């Protein structure tokens, strides 16, 4: 069965606290034909993400005011199981052209972290990190590398957090096997965060097989090396040389 996925605008890097992961979960419940996430309770979000109900309520209030993410929210209060429940209908704003994809398995990933609140904090960090990765990759490359490695001061400014918080997040992410340091930057290892895009064509399927093999075997994946051509009718044609010379030695699974 094909995995379900969600598209997320890179504008989530401009929101604070745990709002990115809360928005991502709401978006994952959206009907793509109507752009509506219906019958989503704040209690459901709290239980699914492992964060307090009060934190979710504050996050939802902030998201309601951000028209780049949520157009409007219609609340319906009902009595269920002897108590009031508020079901929200979220009219989700249309993504601009700058977005990325995640598999919905991301929300169920325990990341080998026992504490749910810590998992959610890390997931929120990974989503925001993805927004500033090199286009169609899960690699963040420093503009001004420090000793051929990650420039943490630069990264903290791009994420809008202080370096102390960044260091804690990076340490947790490395220990949980969610990122690794590479030359001049770092690589997101979580395979629920799609490096490029979700498309059912042979080139993309082959690239994802190569990509997953690399992640599983400790190899830094090759970038998608598409040649992009915009046609007269405005359509986009991609041509992909799938196996760069440096990766032709890899033994990959057979495509069926």
Annotate the PLM regions:
Residues 236-238:
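Short linear proline/tyrosine/threonine-rich motifs used for host-factor recruitment
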Residues 52-62, 162-172:
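Short amphipathic alpha-helical interaction segments
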Residues 91-109, 196-223:
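Short, amphipathic alpha-helical interaction segments positioned at domain boundaries
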Residues 245-254:
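Conserved small/polar residues in nucleotide/adenosyl-binding loops
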Residues 75-98, 184-206:
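Short, cationic-aromatic polyanion-contact patches
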Residues 65-76, 174-184:
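A short, conserved structural fragment
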Residues 1-44, 48, 61, 65-69, ...:
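Short recognition helix of helix-turn-helix/winged-helix DNA-binding domains
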Residues 43-52, 152-162:
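Short helix-coil junctions and helix-kink-helix linkers
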